[in-house]
Amino acid sequence: MVPAGDQAEEAIVADAGKEEAEVRAAMGVEQDGKFSMTSLLWHGGSVWDAWFSCASNQVAQVLLTLPYSFSQLGMLSGLLLQVFYGLMGSWTAYLISVLYVEYRARKEKEGVSFKNHVIQWFEVLDGLLGPYWKAAGLAFNCTFLLFGSVIQLIACASNIYYINDRLDKRTWTYIFGACCSTTVFIPSFHNYRIWSFLGLGMTTYTAWYLAIAAAVHGQVDGVTHSGPSKMVLYFTGATNILYTFGGHAVTVEIMHAMWKPQKFKYIYLVATLYVFTLTLPSASAMYWAFGDALLTHSNAFSLLPRSGWRDAAVILMLIHQFITFGFACTPLYFVWEKAIGMHGTRSVLTRALARLPIVVPIWFLAIIFPFFGPINSAVGALLVSFTVYIIPSLSHILTYRSASARLNAAEKPPPFLPSWSGMFVVNVFVVAWVLVVGFGLGGWASVTNFIKQIDTFGLFAKCYQCPPRAHAGAPLPAPPRH
């Protein structure tokens, strides 16, 4: 007799194999092994594609705000919290992958076909736990992805300003909003193969540029490292790191794009380990060199002298933020398509036109709240806490609370934690920690800091944290207080 879990995996593999053949045929990819440029650049679904997608999506503009977080936390806390939240995020990404496999296995046993349908997290929750969980997952996930897209637009405007300051940041936001709207033409995560690969290369360059440039620059005169100095700053910085390693709100969509999604289990962990090689050296080197000056410079580029190397890093980050905007927006496009009955449409142009209304509110919110840095912490505390930490942990406990569910589970506990009780204990710890530290203390600190930005700069700020321009006979304005 074949165990239930093995049967479930075989069913998913068989269905994925059919889907791969159908997609290849539809795209004109040859079956006899001949080289195809379309397949190389556009047709992604392997384990490597998923790894590049996870790693690329995890380290976008946060590279530039992590030094700011270090100035709030101090060096030791900054390093430890990165490792802690990185491992915690890998755990909940693993839980999401397990629940996806469970949901898909159950549905395929019922004869449900997912041809021309992308499974999403709220549908997994609906199938396993019911409509109330679906509503919670839909609300938190969509709101998080909405603001995740907003953050990418804000980051584009913030970065390009360090190359061309003839236009203010608000104007740059208008321009990049129009550029990023072209992501409506990318059908699904299958088609991010070349973009994910390039995106990770771009962030790798930027991270090592920050680390090396800071080391070469050396410590500024009179540098101080007073962090952590205030509770509100400490927990604001901590929630930015919580946000950094909470990029798996698109895990289900990435898994669904794989030919063999049951192989996803440890991909996010391996991606996180690579991300550590980028975030730890760059953030610590920048904080060592500039110290407390980072408290009023949330974008690391602002403290480094202009050079060809810096301009290259800025341009590469701009391209990568376009890619990350697409990553965050694509699940929103899917939700909208399903709501208006366009999800099964094969025409790329028709789907692109149907998706455009999603870009408008993102554009508008980026203009209202241009607070690069503080907005990351607020989103991390209020949305990421639930979307990618609390809800996956609770839903895993509830899905496997009965003995029969555990017996027939499509995925058994992992080798490194081979008991259901052990998994439940870890899940309870994650829920308690994130609820108290992430949402509670982090929410208080990040919202307090966010309100200060509004009080200092106002909504619709034309040029957030721009250096003051000198005017004859006019005193320079005081720098913003944090």
Swiss-Prot record:
Entry's localization field: Cell membrane
GO biological process, one term: auxin-activated signaling pathway
Residues in the signal sequence: none
GO molecular function terms noted in the UniProt entry: amino acid transmembrane transporter activity; symporter activity
Main location: membrane
Keyword Amino-acid biosynthesis: no
Pfam family, one: Aa_trans
Segments traversing the membrane: 59-76, 79-99, 135-155, 172-192, 194-214, 232-252, 266-286, 314-334, 356-376, 378-398, 424-444
Organism domain of life: Eukaryota
Membrane topology qualifier: Multi-pass membrane protein
Cytoplasmic side: 1-58, 100-134, 193, 253-265, 335-355, 399-423
Function: Carrier protein involved in proton-driven auxin influx. May mediate the formation of auxin gradient from developing leaves (site of auxin biosynthesis) to tips.
Family from the record: Belongs to the amino acid/polyamine transporter 2 family. Amino acid/auxin permease (AAAP) (TC 2.A.18.1) subfamily.
Protein's UniProt name: Auxin transporter-like protein 2
